Structure formats: structure tokens, C-alpha cells
Design a protein with these regions (language model features):
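Class I SAM-dependent transferase core
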Residues: 4-89, 97-101, 105, 118-128, ...
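Conserved nucleotide-cofactor-binding alpha/beta core module
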Residues: 81-191
Length: 192
């Protein structure tokens, strides 16, 4: 059971995260700011990471996987300019934080996660948060989730060195794709 003091503390941390990490990075679009202020990041990390949920760094999810730092996620979302009618594929969704944030902006989100335990936890967390426009799909990240597409936007969590053709084929003509390149740069590519 969460105490009022703990809830207030996390709420203050969420506000501080946006004010000190997101806004100073020139991310000022209201839908992104509102979503990041609304989604309880601490609910989408392993319990051992809750106290670090709002730090300005990637959080380890285990197995070499990370939850992107708030600034990086916000910059990617800013570049994608997700609209209210967009269908979004969130690849490597982990415990569901990014999908929850995106769900505030898009008509629907498919959260793809290959780790079955993470996928199950993501689904439970998203349901508990009232995110009824997110589908959690368990499967290989490199395969995408074609049965739910095609997608207006595809976002990849974590670094990749190349984009699998199977994923590119799931992007609508004129759709947007964003990922972090393995050397640390943000890449946004328009296909169509």
C-alpha cells in the first residue's frame, strides 16, 4: 500500500523530471509534457528501481535492456510528432512506460516485448493505469507485430545497428520511424 507521502514524493519527482530534464531539452509540446506528467514512471520499473525512476539516466531492466532516460524518450516523441489518429508500434516496450506515455497522444499503441515476463508485467501495469488503447504483443522484436499494423509511427526502445525489413514493411507510406543508433545518436527517418 502506498502512503500519501510517497505518492506526493513521486508526484514531485515527476514534475521535477519534466522541469529539469524534458523542458530544458527544448521539448515543449503540450501532449508530451502532459503525458510525462500524468504517467507514473515508478509503476513501470522493477521494484528495486522505483527510487531511481525519475533520474536522468537509462534504468537497467535486466538482460542488457534499459528504460530510456526521460530526456531521450521525450526528444524522440517530439521528433515523431505523434497525432491523435496515429497507430504506433512501440518496439522493446519493456514494462510499458513508453507505451503508457504514447497512449496519451495516439489513438492506439501496440507495445511489442519479447521477454514474456516483462510483457505480462507491462500488460498488468497498463491495465492498472487504465490504458485501454494499448495492446501488449509478446514476440520477437525484429519481427514487429504485422497483424496489428500498418503503423503511422514506429518507435524502437534501445539501440539498433540496422532496421529489419520485416519492421520497415509494417510502416505506412509516409510514416515515421525513430530509434537510437548504437553509437548514441538519435535517428528519425521518413519512409514513403
Amino acid at each position: 500500500r502506498t502512503s500519501l507521502a510517497a505518492m506526493t514524493d513521486y508526484s514531485a519527482r515527476r514534475t521535477m523530471m519534466v522541469d529539469t530534464q524534458v523542458r530544458p531539452s527544448d521539448v515543449t509540446k503540450f501532449p508530451i509534457i502532459d503525458a510525462m506528467l500524468s504517467v507514473k514512471r515508478e509503476d513501470f520499473v522493477p521494484s528495486a528501481q522505483r527510487e531511481a525512476a525519475y533520474m536522468g539516466e537509462n534504468l537497467s531492466l535486466g538482460g542488457g535492456r534499459v528504460l530510456l532516460e526521460p530526456r531521450t524518450l521525450a526528444k524522440m516523441l517530439d521528433a515523431l510528432d505523434i497525432g491523435a489518429d496515429d497507430l504506433v508500434l512501440d518496439i522493446g516496450a519493456g514494462y510499458g512506460y513508453s507505451a503508457a506515455v504514447i497512449a496519451h497522444m495516439a489513438v492506439a499503441v501496440v507495445a511489442l516485448e519479447e521477454d514474456e515476463d516483462m510483457a505480462r508485467d507491462a500488460e498488468e501495469g497498463l491495465m492498472a493505469a487504465g490504458m485501454d488503447n494499448v495492446i501488449v504483443h509478446a514476440g520477437p522484436l525484429s519481427a514487429g507485430a504485422a497483424e496489428h499494423g500498418p503503423y503511422d509511427v514506429i518507435l524502437v526502445q534501445g539501440g539498433i545497428s540496422d532496421i529489419p525489413d520485416a519492421v520497415i514493411d509494417q510502416l505506412k507510406d509516409g510514416g515515421l520511424f525513430a530509434c537510437r543508433c548504437l553509437f548514441g545518436a538519435l535517428g528519425v527517418v521518413r519512409f514513403g
